UniProtKB/Swiss-Prot annotation:
<dbReference type="GO" id="GO:0070475">
    <property type="term" value="P:rRNA base methylation"/>
</dbReference>
<feature type="binding site">
    <location>
        <position position="59"/>
    </location>
    <ligand>
        <name>S-adenosyl-L-methionine</name>
    </ligand>
</feature>
<dbReference type="InterPro" id="IPR029063">
    <property type="entry name" value="SAM-dependent_MTases_sf"/>
</dbReference>
<dbReference type="GO" id="GO:0071424">
    <property type="term" value="F:rRNA (cytosine-N4-)-methyltransferase activity"/>
</dbReference>
<keyword id="KW-0698">rRNA processing</keyword>
<comment type="similarity">
    <text>Belongs to the methyltransferase superfamily. RsmH family.</text>
</comment>
<feature type="binding site">
    <location>
        <begin position="39"/>
        <end position="41"/>
    </location>
    <ligand>
        <name>S-adenosyl-L-methionine</name>
    </ligand>
</feature>
<dbReference type="GO" id="GO:0005737">
    <property type="term" value="C:cytoplasm"/>
</dbReference>
<keyword id="KW-0489">Methyltransferase</keyword>
<feature type="binding site">
    <location>
        <position position="83"/>
    </location>
    <ligand>
        <name>S-adenosyl-L-methionine</name>
    </ligand>
</feature>
<feature type="binding site">
    <location>
        <position position="107"/>
    </location>
    <ligand>
        <name>S-adenosyl-L-methionine</name>
    </ligand>
</feature>
<keyword id="KW-0963">Cytoplasm</keyword>
<protein>
    <recommendedName>
        <fullName>Ribosomal RNA small subunit methyltransferase H</fullName>
        <ecNumber>2.1.1.199</ecNumber>
    </recommendedName>
</protein>
<dbReference type="InterPro" id="IPR002903">
    <property type="entry name" value="RsmH"/>
</dbReference>
<comment type="function">
    <text>Specifically methylates the N4 position of cytidine in position 1402 (C1402) of 16S rRNA.</text>
</comment>
<keyword id="KW-0949">S-adenosyl-L-methionine</keyword>
<dbReference type="Pfam" id="PF01795">
    <property type="entry name" value="Methyltransf_5"/>
</dbReference>
Length: 309
């Protein structure tokens, strides 16, 4: 079995510089790392904060909470919750929010988590292993139409129908799927054509992970919450790793970075923009060469205006 890979934080300096607006001096105020992971961004942010700065992190993963316990800095705190709970912070109280979406290398490379088709392990895929339904449990009760919709909508898999039928047929003949190897083998048999350089199970595993963790719904909730909690001039920095995430982030920033006119009342004052889009950044060639998993990353940055949410 391959050894688990060490997590390499993607766009580390670029993200923190964007969050802190390139500040050369230690900064004050309340900051949020909405997806602690293994703490790469949090540790770098803490290095840039002054004595009056504070960093609040969020993460669902018990392993992330365990890693966060190693940070003894009094300016740091973490909540064992998803980042949709940003909504519980006071309005206008935060100077910057950073979101690094997706799964970390330690999660992917730990067979016991069930995120990867490369390792045999339980078919779990929950970000928070202390609560919720596993992929195995859901596949044991969902019908073919439900399974196909999830794989199609969240994996953009054109063979979603045949895959779903194969899962249900396997369940009816041999019992429910229980490990990643069984699912990967079944998907490989149902996918009629292969994409060069991509395992046929890639899209199905992505879809089931996104669905079981309600990742896109939580992202939408967290983005809306960030609009309310960010102070005027505060930064929103989001790193995404696939088109479904990036599309949501891109559309959210675009929606709030333009004046909105009510066509039913053409002479009414338009709703002013609440965000100023500051662009997107991709990893450098050097970063991709050092960390192949950074290849698909896209970072989008926006600044909060003074218009109320």
């Amino acid at each position: 079995m391959n050894q688990p890979l060490q997590h390499i934080t993607v766009l580390l300096d670029e993200a923190v510089d964007a969050l802190l607006d390139g500040a050369a001096q230690p900064v004050a105020g309340q900051w949020v790392d909405a997806t602690f992971g293994r703490g790469g961004h949090s540790r770098r942010i803490l290095q840039r904060l002054g004595p009056d700065g504070a960093l609040l992190a969020f993460d669902k993963d018990p392993d992330a909470i365990e890693e966060a316990a190693r940070i003894t800095d009094a300016r740091f705190s973490i909540r064992h919750e998803g980042f949709r709970h940003l909504s519980e912070l006071p309005a206008g109280s935060v100077q910057g929010v950073l979101m690094d979406l997706g799964v970390s290398s330690p999660q992917i490379d730990n067979p016991e988590r069930g995120f990867s088709f490369r390792f045999e392990g339980p078919l779990d895929m929950r970000m928070d292993t202390t609560r919720g339904q596993s992929v195995a449990d859901w596949l044991a009760e969902a019908d073919a139409q439900q399974i196909a919709e999830v794989i199609r909508d969240y994996g953009e898999e054109r063979f979603a129908g045949p895959i779903a039928k194969a899962i249900v047929a396997r369940r009816e003949s041999q019992g429910p799927l229980r490990n990643t190897a069984e699912l990967a083998e079944l998907v490989a048999g149902a996918v009629r054509t292969r994409e060069a350089g991509q395992n046929p199970a890639t899209r199905t595993f992505q879809a089931l992970r996104i669905f079981i963790n309600a990742e896109l719904e939580e992202l939408e909730q967290a983005l809306e919450a960030s609009l309310r909690v960010l102070a005027p001039g505060g930064r929103l920095v989001v790193i995404s790793f696939h088109s479904l995430e990036d599309r949501i982030v891109k559309q959210f920033i675009a929606k709030h970075s333009k004046e909105v006119y009510d066509r039913r009342a053409p002479f009414a004052v338009p709703t002013p923009m609440r965000l100023e889009a500051l662009g997107r950044i991709k990893p450098s060639e050097a970063e991709v060469a050092a960390n192949a998993r950074s290849r698909s990353a896209v970072m989008r940055v926006a600044r909060r205006t003074g218009v109320p949410a």
